[in-house]
Each structure stands twice: as C-alpha cells, then as structure tokens.
Amino acid sequence: MPKLTQLSLVTLALTAGSTLVSQTASAHGYVVSPESRSYACKTGSNVNCGAVQWEPQSVEGASGFPESGPADGKIASAANGAFSPLDEQSPSRWSKRDIKSGWNDFSWQFTANHVTRNWRYYLTRQGWDQNQPLSRASFDLAPFCVIDGGMVQPPKLVTHNCYVPEDRSGYQVILAVWEVGDTTNSFYNAIDVNFSSGAVVPGEWTDIGDINPSLDLKAGDKVMTRVFDANGEQSAKQTQITIADATQGAKQNWPFLLASAINAQQPQLKAGQKNAAGVISPVYGKNEIFAAPKSGLERVEVSFDIAPAPGNQLNVTSLADDYTIVDGAAQVSFDVSTNADMQVSAYLFSHDGTAAGYVTQAVNNTSASLVLDVVAPKAGHYHLQVKAEPKQGEVIQQNFDLFLKDQATAPDADFIFPEGIKSYVAGTKVLQPKTGKVYQCKPWPYNGYCVQWSPTATGFEPGIGNSWTMAWTEL
C-alpha cells in the first residue's frame, strides 16, 4: 500500500477583500462524485432513505473519528437519528459506483463552505461484514488520503485527487470526513463503491440504470423496463413481468424476478449486483442494470402498470326464505362478508313499507352474523335491504324478500329426522321430533354438514347438536 498521501487543496484561494463566514454559520456539504450514500438518496439512485433525501448536506456529527465521533453502527448517519436509514447495511441495500484502484477524484459540493480543518478518507477492510452496520471494525482506521484545509474557507466545489489502495476488490465503502475548523463537528459521507478485479479496463459492462425496491406490488400488477439509446426508446429491448401474488409483489422480491427476466431475455443487458470477480447476478432488493460494451444503450428506466384494485364486495348468506313467529316474537338472522372495512346495515320493511327492524355492524374484510329483531311481527311478506358503506367507494345495496309465518303455519317438512339423511341437500326441510320444530339445510358450503350424523356423532343434529347452527336454519 502506498504511503499516506498529503495533498494540497486544489484551487483553494480566497479572493481579495472576501470575508470569512460567521462563526455561527451552518456548514453543510456532501460528496457528489462518486455519489455518496446520502447524495444518491437525493438523486433517486437510493430509495427508502427517509429525511436525508431532502438534506444530504446535513449528515453532521461530533468530530474525532475514529478515536471518538459517531458510535459504531451509527457512522453512516453521523449518529443523527433523523438520518438513521443511512445505517442500514446489506450487500444489496445501496447503489454502488464502479471505482478503480490508484488515483481517483473525490468532489465535494458545499451549500455553506465553512472554514475547514481537514478532509479524511477511510476505506473498509477486505472481507468486512457487509451485513452489519458500519463500525470501526469495518474500516482500516488509517486514512488513505488526508487533505489539509488550512483553516480557511474552501470554494463551493472542491475536488481531491487521492490514491486508492490496490488491495481491495468487490463491494467496499469509503468514509469521507469533512472536519470543519470553527465548530466541534464533522460531516460524514459513506460512499458505496465496487472494485473490479484489477484496474477498470475499457470494454466493461456499464451501469445505466437501477431496479429500486421502491414499493410493494399486488397480483396483476406489471413492472417493466424502458431502454433508451441515443435515438430514443428501444421498445424491442423491453422486459416485463406480471406479479402473480403478494409474495412475488413484496418490494424485496420483485426486483430479483425482474433482474432474472432481463438476464434471460436481453443479451445486451445484465441486471444484478457485481461481485468481487465482476460477475453480475440478481439479488433480492436493489439491482443495477448494466449495458454490454459497444451496445449503444444509454439508459434504462423501470415503470409500473398498476392493476385496478378489486371493487368493494358484499356477500349475504344463510338467509332463509321464511322465519317463524314464536310467542309473538321473530328474528331474521343471516351472515355477511366484505372484502374491505365497511359498516353493514340491514333494514326490514313490511309489505306496505313500514319499518320493521334494523341492525348494523362494522365488518372489516371478514364475515359476521347479524340478527335482526322484528318489530311487531305479523305473518306475511317482508322486504330486507342490506347496505354496506365502505370508507372509500360507493355504497353497496342488496335486496331480499322473505316471509314470516306463524308457528301453526310453519312449513311442511320433507323428512322426519333422521329419515332419508343421505338425500339431504341445501334447502331440505326436516321435522325434529325432539323439539317439534322444522329446520332447513343451509346452502353451500354448509350443506355438507347436514348429512354428517350417526347415533354416536350428533354434533350437527338439527336443534340438538353442539354445532347444529353450522348446518341448519330453524324455520
């Protein structure tokens, strides 16, 4: 490894008559080339970054690294809780920029160019743990480049030419530290880079796009590439996948599927993450898109075709054709189910339109049993109106007709239970001699329970068994 290089600041001169910034001024800045982790959040190369996407210049913390400064696990965010997403770490979490060993330029953009003590550049060790937040153990704690700031105010744009060590390969992180001269703070910029094996040579595949895990998709959604060269979009080079289910649509999963499809369909493109040997393979999470040498391809974008959400649905089941008035009282019972959060209300009207009962219940993407007490029940025709009011969308209304019958006019039974049990189907009516009442077999999918009976297995016996209401409706 070359000796520690002390470089003079490039183009560091104050014009005559200029004044220093106030000691209380706010110093801000970030590395723009190669893109720092925070700046890539601003440009969109990195996603799900939180507040730093609007303030990449503000990743500021206590000075003194590595002896003091941000704690291990919080180095990338400078221990600033507002920017804690920067501390997330995995091999595929962050966009990377290709870099070569040897001389490289590092450019800072300052929004408030404060008096500067120095800039320092650190590099992760070969074999560092890419799945753990950055710590001092991740880095070679001797900086590979130090720039003396001279305790003067730098220009708004500064470029340092530094010699990057030769004994690294694959994914590494450069920690760029700007130590200001008149406060106790420094600015910390993590730079995610990828070393090829050996020096970068002409003819390598070029990074021209990203597949960012930006959102969860649902079944029926489509995600596709848009490929551009100097002449515009090349539709023949588009790759598209359709999401089959929620698992495929998870934002860490579909980028892997799209990258795999690109690699299978497009000979001039490769998608994935580049390993230490330069091999590009799909990963779960963020993937890069690379163009073949001399392909002429310049840019790849990712777009979505989001399938419309299914409409609000209300299902009413277990509603009988008629209900019996017993001792001057009657109830109308039935089941409802919804596919969203809805307030389900049922209104009962007599044949002449007189209100005869009401019940309401919140039902959120599930099923519920509703029981409506009939007001002053009389034998005859009734109209049931069931309304479901979703939090979003139009009200759903379904209408049903039913009859109330006096006990004496209860419907005739088809069988006396358990005679003919093997022939019971939905709608079959049986007289239960143990209760003297008539019961009707419920419609599918419950009618299968009606034939499940033996002298030693009476769970679904109408009016008697522990679970008889799953199979039967009392008439």
UniProtKB/Swiss-Prot annotation:
Keywords: Chitin-binding, Secreted, Signal. Residues 1-27 form the signal peptide. One of its GO terms (cellular component) is extracellular region. It is found in: Secreted. Gene3D superfamilies: 2.60.40.2550, 3.30.70.2150, chitin-binding protein cbp21 (2.70.50.50). One of its GO terms (molecular function) is chitin binding. The keyword Signal applies. It comes from the Bacteria. Its main location: secreted. The keyword Signal applies. Probably interacts with GlcNAc residues. May promote attachment to both epithelial cell surfaces and chitin. Belongs to the GbpA family. This is GlcNAc-binding protein A. It comes from Shewanella oneidensis (strain ATCC 700550 / JCM 31522 / CIP 106686 / LMG 19005 / NCIMB 14063 / MR-1). The gene is gbpA.
